[in-house]
């Protein structure tokens, strides 16, 4: 690597304070957007309206940033707002004509993302439309996803491997008599790259394999935990429900249909690198052109998958910066009240007891107290209590 390449790499990594600021600014916006969307999740609310509200909020908030920058800075939605209910695994972000509404008692998964200058913050959260504390299998599956996310946060650290996380989250889900859903991938994030080459599998299988890799300092990951009360093997029911796509920049196939060429030109101009929703395209032409674009690899679809009717699926997704002083989780939201459950498994208890931040070396107790008086955050995270469902 040349010295220029090394400098460019450094300027785009967490060693640059400006990069850290952009990640955290994107996270602040998407965390607020999640609150806005949650407030709209009520019985009889139209799902497409909620999705539109989430995306609009992110666009409005990011539009006011870096307006006076000398170079044009891309910013906005990094992943369209999705509202996936009950046994729907994810990626449900319907077209404007869709009449789907939320109902009382629905388990709602919200998935969304924001970026500033291509530095991406993603978040996923699960909420049940009911008053008071949760119970039964709905509570179990949310607790399973949340505890698995807490364990993943402690294992996505320099020196650990992606396979360590895959094995651990499955063990956690089993403690709640739930399954981690197959086919869900957690990716390293880089500037303008939502699906980096370092990948954590939700479930390893002969059909789905990735290279074993080690986490390293100054990397960023979006960790996506999806748990189910069912068998964790979701199915595609209707290809027409797919509305989220991402352009594959490596494909150069010459499209035949005029509608396809029009659509791909529009996508290149408006969504060159981030996933987008077909709602953002001219609907009639999109219907005609998207099929050829997908068939020839120009677009990567994000399909809407389902577990069996009666199953419940919960998601917790977060973005984490692997800083020199430890892991910094920058996206989250507080869960509803869950019943306490004691985890007996010593290995899971051990994972939950791991700190997230590194201890400061050579610091004396007095100095630590002084820092505390000034309101500085402790550099050693509180270990999780394995006897309760600690909430985000």
From Swiss-Prot:
Induction details: Cell-cycle regulated expression with accumulation during the G1-to-S phase. Accumulates in response to auxin. Expression levels correlate with genes involved in ribosome biogenesis and function.
Signal peptide feature range: none
Localization terms from the record: Nucleus
Stretches for region Interaction with RNA: 355-372
InterPro entries xrefs: Creatinase/aminopeptidase-like (IPR036005), PA2G4 (IPR004545), PA2G4/ARX1 (IPR047113), Pept_M24 (IPR000994), Pept_M24_MAP (IPR001714), WH-like_DNA-bd_sf (IPR036388), WH_DNA-bd_sf (IPR036390)
Motif Nuclear localization signal positions after renumbering to this chain: 357-367
Consequence of gene loss (knockout): Distorted reduced growth leading to small plants, and impaired fertility. At the seedling stage, a delay in leaf initiation and distorted leaf shape were characteristic of the silenced lines.
Chain segments carrying region RNA-binding: 48-56
GO biological process, one term: rRNA processing
Region (Disordered): 358-392
Biased composition (Basic residues): 358-369
Keywords, ordered alphabetically: Auxin signaling pathway, Developmental protein, Nucleus, Ribonucleoprotein, RNA-binding, rRNA processing
Region Necessary for nucleolar localization: start-end pairs: 1-50, 298-392
Function per UniProt: Binds RNA. Associates with 28S, 18S and 5.8S mature rRNAs, several rRNA precursors and probably U3 small nucleolar RNA. May be involved in regulation of intermediate and late steps of rRNA processing. May be involved in ribosome assembly. Required for expression of cell cycle genes such as CYCD3-1, RNR2A and CDKB1-1. Promotes, in a dose- and auxin-dependent manner, organ growth by stimulating both cell proliferation and expansion, via the regulation of RBR1 levels.
Family: Belongs to the peptidase M24 family.
Oligomer status and interactors: Component of a ribonucleoprotein complex. Interacts with REIL1 and REIL2.
Protein's name in the database: ERBB-3 BINDING PROTEIN 1
Lineage per the UniProt record: Eukaryota, Viridiplantae, Streptophyta, Embryophyta, Tracheophyta
